[in-house]
Amino acid sequence: MKLLILTCLVAAALALPRAHRRNAVSSQTQQENSSSEEQEIVKQPKYLSLNEEFVNNLNRQRELLTEQDNEIKITMDSSAEEQATASAQEDSSSSSSSSEESKDAIPSATEQKNIANKEILNRCTLEQLQRQIKYSQLLQQASLAQQASLAQQASLAQQALLAQQPSLAQQAALAQQASLAQQASLAQQASLAQKHHPRLSQVYYPNMEQPYRMNAYSQVQMRHPMSVVDQAQFSVQSFPQLSQYGAYPLWLYFPQDMQYLTPEAVLNTFKPIAPKDAENTNVW
């Protein structure tokens, strides 16, 4: 029974280093894959580069993790060597050394548990760092996309303004043409009116001077009426012969407002005019 127990312990001790080596190899491959992915991320264009401080902190954390992994590997190698030497000693030693080997196997199991826990922690930290890097990259991409959309909107607005300027110029030209056409039509209408209503001739006719004076005098009389004597004197004046004005109608020669003679005015013209104090005057 003791021999069976010893053989089982030896087989377990020999099998454990191989599992640790496999775990170490798998951790190395994962680290290489993560490093390759990080390199691909770093190879992206310059406008997607992260802030220097943030990148430096990430690199420091990575270096610490790699140092911890190296320490774990060294401890695993040393433990494997120790186990190999112990197995060689167990083969050469007698049954008295079985108790000592069992005592040595117990602390080696605790060390392996600690190593496994450290590896799990390192993997968790690496995954967290990768997530942070991806999140920062997504934020930068979103900001760049927003800037590109704003620039595109500004360019579209500028193009719309440039396209609108010719239309405004056309509208101004059309308005100017309409105003010119309106002015031309007004000038044409004025010329037609001048043709249908010609101006009075500006030639001087001396025979027509007296009717014009009579018309002006009648307008003044409407404002300031004359006395009876003045009316009589004005009515006695002889009119020129109408034979001289045969080429023109009669309404051009006589005023529109005719002044009729009253009998009192005619009688007053034949009375002698004397001053009121004629009795006191001395006759020479």
UniProtKB/Swiss-Prot annotation:
Annotated protein name in UniProt: Alpha-S1-casein
Compositionally biased residues, Low complexity: 24-36, 78-99
Family membership: Belongs to the alpha-casein family.
Coiled-coil ranges (or none): none
Sequence-type repeats, residues: 138-143, 144-149, 150-155, 156-161, 162-167, 168-173, 174-179, 180-185, 186-191, 192-197
InterPro entries (alphabetical): Alpha-s1_casein (IPR026999), Casein (IPR001588), Casein_CS (IPR031305)
Localization of this protein: Secreted
Residue list for modification Phosphoserine: S79, S93, S94, S95, S96, S97, S98, S99
Function comment: Important role in the capacity of milk to transport calcium phosphate.
Predominant location: secreted
GO biological process per UniProt: response to 11-deoxycorticosterone; response to dehydroepiandrosterone; response to estradiol; response to progesterone
UniProt region (Disordered), positions on chain: 21-44, 78-111
Range of residues in the leader sequence: 1-15
Annotated tissue distribution: Mammary gland specific. Secreted in milk.
Pfam families: Casein
Record's keyword terms, sorted: Milk protein, Phosphoprotein, Repeat, Secreted, Signal
Gene Ontology cellular-component annotations: extracellular region; extracellular space
Organism per entry: Rattus norvegicus (Rat)
